[in-house]
């Protein structure tokens, strides 16, 4: 069996979309490859921050990486591509020390939807990305729509859609237009303050917004808890019965400012739950060109408008939309189609 060295974040130590996606991919690959793991851990409190502890961790990972590649013939390095100046330097260091000690291929996974925007951000970002692309063997994007124009058609680029494990077809429930669900970490860029601000202004029926997530810092936690009321519930991370809660919610709201191909939307689709989301990353492509409940990120008026559009939509039409979302998940994002594509990327032919 060939050997894969994985470097990245994994649950249960790290819980977010990327770590969960990593775990799914490693689970599949471990059936056909020997997997060597160097786990990366960045607490949510360090989100979007550079720190001495991060530098120390990178040096520790490089030390472990060098040890693995000198003792084992590694055929593939598999890692996530970070999108920041600091993150790009980390990518380049991992790539450099892997190539220095191994003849294997370096495969990096891009989980974000702003690759091209970062590339065009500055002269420095262009130089960092150009150097990295020159040295890397393969870049995995989440969708053809997220592959930057300047990389389309090159052999180094491919895509792999996300999937949900465990996969199950849930019963479609009547939509009462009452129960709203926010299920993401409490990060400002996830739009948590946007939905809280808008939801407290909505004057319609017996609405309830349940929010689940992990806090990233004390200041933001205080801002979020300010909105707690009889119809807005702020809760900790959801660890049990997640799919049942998604399935029983009337609508899931994801007001993110930036996304790639969010797992929470795939989870809602699998459960047949209506989605209200910002139109960022691959979300329009995931839900379909004519999906009605999308709004412009950071635009609170547009978010409010879409919520009222949902509330005024006929119940039968909502059931039809639930059926459509569930069918779309199983046609485009099933475990089986994901597995075939993943194994092909790593050169495994059954």
How would you label these PLM feature ranges?
Residues 221-238:
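Nucleotide-activated donor-binding/catalytic signature segment of Leloir-type glycosyltransferases, i.e.
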Residues 274-277:
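Short hydrophobic beta-strand element within catalytic cores of glycosyltransferases
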Residues 315-347:
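A charged, aromatic-enriched C-terminal amphipathic alpha-helix characteristic of glycosyltransferases
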Residues 257:
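Aromatic "clamp/platform" in nucleotide-sugar-dependent glycosyltransferases that forms part
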Residues 39-43, 183, 208-221:
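Glycosyltransferase donor-sugar binding loop
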Residues 128-169:
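Donor nucleotide-sugar binding/catalytic pocket of nucleotide-sugar-dependent glycosyltransferases
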Residues 5-7, 171-190, 195-201, 209-212:
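Conserved donor-binding/catalytic core segment of Leloir-type glycosyltransferases
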Residues 289, 293-300, 309-315:
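Conserved acidic donor-binding segment of nucleotide-sugar-dependent glycosyltransferases
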């Amino acid at each position: 069996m060939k050997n894969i060295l994985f470097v990245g974040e994994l649950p249960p130590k790290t819980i977010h979309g990327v770590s969960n996606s990593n775990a799914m991919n490693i689970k599949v690959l471990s059936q056909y490859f020997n997997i060597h793991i160097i786990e990366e851990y960045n607490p949510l409190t360090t989100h979007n921050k550079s720190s001495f502890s991060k530098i120390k961790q990178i040096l520790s990972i490089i030390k472990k990486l060098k040890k693995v590649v000198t003792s084992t013939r590694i055929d593939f390095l598999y890692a996530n591509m970070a999108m920041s100046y600091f993150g790009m330097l980390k990518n380049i260091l991992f790539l450099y020390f892997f190539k220095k000690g191994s003849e294997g291929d370096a495969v990096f996974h891009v989980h974000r939807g702003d690759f091209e925007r970062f590339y065009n951000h500055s002269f420095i970002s262009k130089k960092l990305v150009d150097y990295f692309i020159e040295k890397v063997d393969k870049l995995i994007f989440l969708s053809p729509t997220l592959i930057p124009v300047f990389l389309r058609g090159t052999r180094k680029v491919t895509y792999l859609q996300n999937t949900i494990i465990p996969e199950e077809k849930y019963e479609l429930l009547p939509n009462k237009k009452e129960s709203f669900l926010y299920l993401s970490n409490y990060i400002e860029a996830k739009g948590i303050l946007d939905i809280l601000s808008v939801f407290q202004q909505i004057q319609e029926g017996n609405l309830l917004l349940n929010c689940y997530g992990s806090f990233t810092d004390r200041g933001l936690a205080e801002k979020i808890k300010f909105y707690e009321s009889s119809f807005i519930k702020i809760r900790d991370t959801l660890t049990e019965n997640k799919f049942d809660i998604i399935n029983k919610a009337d609508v899931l709201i994801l007001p993110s400012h930036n996304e790639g191909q969010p797992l929470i939307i795939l989870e809602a689709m699998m459960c047949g739950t209506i989605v209200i989301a910002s139109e960022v990353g691959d979300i329009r492509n995931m839900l379909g060109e004519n999906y009605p409940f999308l709004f412009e990120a950071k635009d609170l008026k547009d978010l409010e408008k879409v919520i009222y559009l949902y509330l005024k939509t006929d119940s039968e039409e909502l059931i039809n939309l639930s059926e459509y979302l569930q069918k779309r998940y199983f046609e485009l994002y099933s475990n089986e189609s994901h597995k075939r594509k993943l194994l092909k990327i790593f050169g495994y032919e059954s």
